[in-house]
Amino acid sequence: MDNSDILMNMMMQQMEKLPEHFSNSNPNPNPHNIMMLSESNTHPFFFNPTHSHLPFDQTMPHHQPGLNFRYAPSPSSSLPEKRGGCSDNANMAAMREMIFRIAVMQPIHIDPESVKPPKRKNVRISKDPQSVAARHRRERISERIRILQRLVPGGTKMDTASMLDEAIHYVKFLKKQVQSLEEHAVVNGGGMTAVAGGALAGTVGGGYGGKGCGIMRSDHHQMLGNAQILR
């Protein structure tokens, strides 16, 4: 399975995770905002197509009409017959960005039980201070890796090295989105510092990012919260 197939599988997995309830009752939805309904609260999520680098103009098929983002077609159906390395890389980058845009529309919820280390049976544990300290250090690293796997789109389906590489791309994507939000706030004359401070405090204060995230009052909050967790 090549990289394009892996990215396509990741995109399909992310789409399956999208909640079923989108605000598609409005016949003329605002293309700059997508409203998503989670369990009991409505969370607005920011999507700015003007900053997208996707070269595709086809609307996503087989999905809810309320979604307003561009779809990166399958490499086998849209790329020219003579595909060079540059076109393949551009298509993979576009597909990766599509996956990330789907991922940022999802609320972050990590079950603390899912990141606990597996229980070891019939294993003698050394009580030597150095061994204990080394074991605790390894456990902390493993716990952070498991958390990161659940934050990175498709991270639970990858090996650690691939997941870390994908995390780098995800952080770069989130940084670009934060810059877009800051530019958007400057153009509108808004105070981005105050908005960002409140969003990051609310997100980080929610522990693993579960129910403590609360209700995001603007479409800036979710993107900034995702970026802060990955920093």
From Swiss-Prot:
Subcellular localization(s) per the UniProt record: Nucleus
Major place of residence: nucleus
GO cellular-component term (any): nucleus
GO terms (BP aspect): carpel formation; gynoecium development; ovary septum development; regulation of DNA-templated transcription; response to temperature stimulus; transmitting tissue development
Observed phenotype of the null mutant: Impaired pollen tube growth.
Induction (UniProt): Negatively regulated by ARF3/ETT in the abaxial gynoecium.
Domain of life assignment: Eukaryota
Record-annotated bHLH domain positions: 125-174
Free-text tissue specificity from the UniProt record: Gynoecium.
Protein keywords: Developmental protein, DNA-binding, Nucleus, Transcription, Transcription regulation
GO molecular function: DNA binding; DNA-binding transcription factor activity; protein dimerization activity
Subunit organization: Homodimer. Interacts with SPT.
Function summary: Required for the female reproductive tract development and fertility.
Protein's name according to its UniProt entry: Transcription factor HEC2
Upper taxonomic lineage: Eukaryota, Viridiplantae, Streptophyta, Embryophyta, Tracheophyta
